[in-house]
């Protein structure tokens, strides 16, 4: 089932890039990011209340809170950079560079989370990097 959700994420991320590029025209990128974030906030809390999972807030550990907040800060920084890049660059070039996050995530998963880094992972990272460079240079 994880694959279905991951594929859905990829489809929606692709739509996000195109919709954002169209919507950001003539709008300050920081303001556009704030508007997008407000929509995401409303949608996320709507899902929490729709599914009745708001009661789980009290059970979240301090460690989880810390890393969720850090993740939120990283997301905010990512979105601010992404929207500015989209505003000044072509979506067909910005998006592939943004997707280098896959390579960075695999490296961090290996170093921080001690996940296995196989020959298959290395080849995949090399292909993603080469494809990105081929596309944007």
Give residue spans per PLM region.
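Hydrophobic residues within membrane-embedded alpha-helical segments of Major Facilitator Superfamily
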Residues: 5, 12, 19, 74-77, ...
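Membrane-interface interhelical linkers
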Residues: 1-8, 27, 40-68, 79-88, ...
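Helix-helix packing/entry segments at the starts of transmembrane helices
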Residues: 31-38, 80, 86-106
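Glycine-/small-residue-enriched transmembrane alpha-helix faces in small-molecule transporters
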Residues: 1-31
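Hydrophobic transmembrane alpha-helices of multi-pass small-molecule transport proteins
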Residues: 44, 120-136
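Hydrophobic/aromatic residues within transmembrane alpha-helices
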Residues: 23, 32, 85, 111-113, ...
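C-terminal transmembrane-helix exit sites in multi-pass transporters
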Residues: 103-122
């Amino acid at each position: 089932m994880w694959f279905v959700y991951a594929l859905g994420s990829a489809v929606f991320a692709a739509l996000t890039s195109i919709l954002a590029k169209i919507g950001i025209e003539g709008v300050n990128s920081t303001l556009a990011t704030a508007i997008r974030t407000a929509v995401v906030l409303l949608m996320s809390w709507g899902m929490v209340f729709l599914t009745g999972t708001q009661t789980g807030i009290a059970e979240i550990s301090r460690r989880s809170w810390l890393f969720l907040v850090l993740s939120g800060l990283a997301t905010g920084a990512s979105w601010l950079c992404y929207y500015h890049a989209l505003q000044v660059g072509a979506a067909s070039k910005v998006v592939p560079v943004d997707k280098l996050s896959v390579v960075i995530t695999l490296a961090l998963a290996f170093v921080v989370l001690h996940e296995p880094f196989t020959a298959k992972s290395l080849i995949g990272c090399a292909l993603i990097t080469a494809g990105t460079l081929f596309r944007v240079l």
